[in-house]
Amino acid sequence: MELFELTIHELHDKLKKKEVSSVEATRALLARIDAVEPRVNAFITVTPEEALKNAEAADRRIAAGDMQLLTGIPIALKDIFLTKGVRTTCASRILDNFIPPYDATSVARLKAQGMVLVGKLNQDEFAMGSSTESSYYGKTHNPWNLECIPGGSSGGSAAAIAARQAIATLGTDTGGSIRQPASHCGCVGLKPTYGRVSRYGVIAYASSLDQVGPVTRDVTDCAIMLGAVAGFDPKDSTSVDLPVPDYSKALSNDVKGLKIGLPKEYFIAGLDPDVQKTMDAAIETYKGLGAQFVEISLPHTDYAVATYYLIATAEASSNLARYDGVRFGHRSSEAQGLIDMYRKSRSEGFGEEVKRRIMLGTYALSSGYYDAYYLKAQKVRTLIMQDFSRAFEEVDVILTPVAPTPAFRIGEKSADPLQMYLSDIFTIPVNLAGTCGMSIPAGFSKDGLPVGLQLVGRPFGEECILRAAYAFEQNTDWHERKASL
């Protein structure tokens, strides 16, 4: 097995036993990036010099006996995380030349463990999308089929794992942006409970929905990464002051008696036959392990997409007002005065999808429509939260598809925003409820594309979904399959 194919825990063991150095592992990974990046386009920025410098420092740390789980591990980050001294664009022209003066809290926590940063990953512009087609830096391709999308908005984070261009990655999830690409690329992706991981230093899209999480090769790595970034942060007012459990200790091959809910609103006519077949097989696997299934109802599911696209766009129109060409970012060189500079800088700097969402959000917040749209959406959000609360009185975990179809072809839904928005129909409710959910590899379509299953837990119930995911992984081999690039 090549060094770039290892998991975090496998590479950690080799580093600990001095069988390999971090510099060797990092060089192998950088060579892999060079080899496949022209076909995948998972990265916006690759940082070879910084990576090798970090790897040398990690090797010194290991030699001194000061080793943590991520010391010397090559990791890549979605280009939405501020990284001190490393360009951070959010895949937008408006931030093309932006170099942050500080690190996001999650980045600082990974650096404190001694991670090796190999680069910043492609995404949908400002995390607005489900296909990683809206990036200013070009489309990312799915390593399983280069003519298909990798999912979005954290498409680069999932594609880099599937293409073996990073040992682990970090993404963000606002309406499914970690789980959906993880499903489409055959990776493990986890969206923690809102408030579990600090959002400080993460470029904001929709502040009440955004959450930071890992994309990895297996569930063990996912637990390691979550443990590294989770925890209270006084710099983030939405961060929750709760102790961080040792997620690795939750990993158990025992789900006997675990009550798993199947929401009838998610298993509907119109679900792709390959997705349905994968879900049926996964349910049988869990039954064989002694889990119990209960049919449940999440009655307000039908309203989730409309609710999300009112709340998220409203928050985006406010959050993105700061990009005006004055203090940082793109400034139009053809402006005639201040107001013209605002208009031209934003018109030139933002892509079509970002402009669409800013306009939708501004409309929803306008005085004549605020009550009819934004306020009503917040009320429906509360009903969706209550649906999940009631469900978790009956069950421990909820099992659903991640997406209605496997990865679709690049360009297939670009001209139809509504079709694109509906591809997140099964992931959006989890963000609106503020609870945790994850995608794990569960099978393949007849065309050889990965299909994931979603496990949803109660708020701060990451240990429970990790346990359920680990048990499934131990009894299947989907996570071991590799894209042949």
UniProtKB/Swiss-Prot annotation:
Keywords in alphabetical order: ATP-binding, Ligase, Nucleotide-binding, Protein biosynthesis
Instruction: Give the PROSITE patterns listed for this entry.
Output: AMIDASES (PS00571)
What is the purpose of this protein? Allows the formation of correctly charged Gln-tRNA(Gln) through the transamidation of misacylated Glu-tRNA(Gln) in organisms which lack glutaminyl-tRNA synthetase. The reaction takes place in the presence of glutamine and ATP through an activated gamma-phospho-Glu-tRNA(Gln).
Q: Which organism is it from?
A: Geotalea uraniireducens (strain Rf4) (Geobacter uraniireducens)
Extract the GO molecular function terms from the UniProt entry: ATP binding; glutaminyl-tRNA synthase (glutamine-hydrolyzing) activity
The entry assigns this protein to a family as follows: Belongs to the amidase family. GatA subfamily.
Looking up Pfam families in the UniProt record yields:
Amidase
What InterPro entries does UniProt report for this protein, alphabetically? Answer: Amidase, Amidase_CS, Amidase_dom, AS_sf, GatA
Provide GO CC annotations from the record: glutamyl-tRNA(Gln) amidotransferase complex
Signal peptide coordinates:
none
HAMAP family, from UniProt?
GatA
The record's Gene Ontology biological-process terms are:
translation
Reply yes or no: does the keyword Protein biosynthesis apply.
yes
- Highest taxon of the lineage: Bacteria
Gene3D superfamilies the record matches: Amidase signature (AS) domain
Query: What enzyme category does the UniProt record give?
Result: ligase
Name this polypeptide is given? Glutamyl-tRNA(Gln) amidotransferase subunit A
Question: Could you give the subunit structure recorded for this chain?
Answer: Heterotrimer of A, B and C subunits.
The reactions it catalyses are:
L-glutamyl-tRNA(Gln) + L-glutamine + ATP + H2O = L-glutaminyl-tRNA(Gln) + L-glutamate + ADP + phosphate + H(+)
- Active-site residues, as the UniProt record annotates them: K78 (charge relay system), S153 (charge relay system), S177 (acyl-ester intermediate)
Name the EC number(s).
6.3.5.7
